[in-house]
Amino acid sequence: ESYAGARSFYRFENTVKDLTGFKHIIPTHQGRAAEKILFEIMGGKGKVIPNNTHFDTTRANIEVSGAAAVDLPVKEALVPSMVKDFKGNMDITALERLLKEKGPEHIPLVMMTVTNNSCAGQPVSMGCIRRVSDLCRSYKIPFFIDACRFAENAWFIKTREPGCKGRSVKKLAQEMFSYADGCTMSGKKDGLVNIGGFLAMNDDELAQKARNILIVTEGFPTYGGLAGRDLEAFAQGLEEVVDEDYLRYRIRSTEYVVEKLDAMGVPVFKPAGGHAVYLDAKAFLPHVPPPQYPGQALACALYLEGGIRSCEIGSVMFGRTDPATGEFHPAMLEMVRLAPPRRPYTQSHMDHRVEGDGGGFAQLD
């Protein structure tokens, strides 16, 4: 717990370096703090930052800096019922078009979120990551990964992408990171911890600027606002999360719920993502228009029906009203996310979720 130079930091740093290969590891108290630092340096008015799909804190930190956040999901990501292996991918053609249109002077970096949380936790293929990396390097634009669920994404690559089945999840994760220039991460996801995040990169000048902001806003570079015990737990979590028995159980639990609900006729986002079951609120409540927030209505109904806490991922989170015209712009998708905590739940808990979700659907008239 030393203020500077605690052993816990060096274990954490070595663990992240071994996993990601990045030169500079900067701890923060949460993932959004890493985003804040990154976009404070690289964002700004007139800048455009593309992503397969930005999550809400990423988008908010970009927009607070004055930059514009642009989502470039593949078309199949917007069709919840369509079954495709990698619906989290970025539309490479759209990215190339944007790079040509705006130029490197207006695009300070390209982001890629793995797995794609705002598109139902869908995975991104290694091929897509590689192609985005190649495109960024051809334009000399840095490529950063939002690595919150890197291990789950690597598991999907292992089980779905040709030529990857014989490789370990850790090796696949290391390859993913090798195509990037840096990453942000929230430890509450695939760090398996209650708090913490980090910003990692190879660029020396960018790292120095980031540490300068870190000291003002988060803490010393060897703790970043975290207690030593949290850094120690974070390091341990990053080692445990690539365990394939853990990942198999984790992913199968989500698949189980999606399969059961789909068989009951409940509109779910397919195929099952990694960290959560996503209900298609637009199909669930077709009579509720986006300005009346079908996802939020469904989230409330699930709590009343089965005591199930969920999260709206739709127009409450991503919708906006044009200040000039007053016109409402809904989110691309209207969903409700049911994200189980890691490790504590058994199949009986999953069955309770099925009963609650299915019961709510059955009561609709």
Task: Map each language-model feature to its residues.
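Conserved PLP-enzyme active-site core in the AAT-like
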Residues: A4-I25, H29-V266, P289-P290
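Short, conserved charged micro-motifs
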Residues: A207-Q208, P286-P294, R343-H352
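Short acidic (Asp/Glu) and glycine-rich catalytic loops that position anionic groups and cofactors
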Residues: R211-L214, L231-E240, H275-L285, A331-R337
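A common structural junction motif
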Residues: T217-E218, G306-I308, G359-L364
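PLP-dependent enzyme catalytic core of the Aspartate aminotransferase-like
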Residues: V241, M317-D365
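Conserved glycine-rich beta-strand-loop-beta hairpin in the small C-terminal domain of fold type I
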Residues: T254-E255, F269-A281
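Active-site loop ensemble at the mouth of alpha/beta enzyme cores that anchors a bound cofactor
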Residues: K282-S310, P323-A331
